[in-house]
């Protein structure tokens, strides 16, 4: 009886969609940059095909590094990042302070180093 049951459901097991490579290639959908103060910047990024929240956080960090360099400064300090996912679209709302010198704090980034790492990983900056 068990064997008959397995035989009848076996054809339906093949109906599961097989993941394709395209589902694992990040699709970076853009960055919105808002200057909140002279050295305080908010970044809103969105992407699909992220494997985890860390992917969209990295995208926001790359945007912050690129923006910092565009402003002619060299460093940024991460203040906060809120991540959300809805219907496969990941978003991050991140705030950084930017500065010409290394700021105080534990979550600081050297914009040149981070931008180079982003380029190596194929993550766009601003």
Predicted regions span which residues?
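C-terminal motif of bacterial Sec signal peptides marking the signal peptidase cleavage site
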Residues: 11-14
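Secreted/extracellular ectodomain signature
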Residues: 16-126
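Sec-dependent signal peptide recognition
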Residues: 1-8
């Amino acid at each position: 009886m068990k064997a008959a049951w397995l035989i009848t459901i076996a054809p339906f097991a093949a109906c599961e969609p097989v993941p394709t490579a395209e589902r694992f290639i990040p699709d970076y959908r853009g960055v919105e940059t808002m200057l909140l103060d002279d050295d305080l910047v908010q970044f809103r990024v969105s992407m699909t095909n992220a494997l985890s929240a860390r992917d969209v956080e990295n995208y926001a960090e790359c945007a912050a590094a690129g923006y910092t360099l565009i402003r002619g400064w060299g460093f940024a300090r991460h203040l906060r990042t809120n991540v959300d996912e809805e219907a496969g679209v990941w978003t991050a709302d991140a705030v950084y302070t930017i500065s010409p010198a290394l700021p105080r704090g534990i979550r600081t980034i050297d914009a040149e180093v981070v931008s180079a790492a982003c380029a190596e990983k194929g993550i766009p900056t601003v």
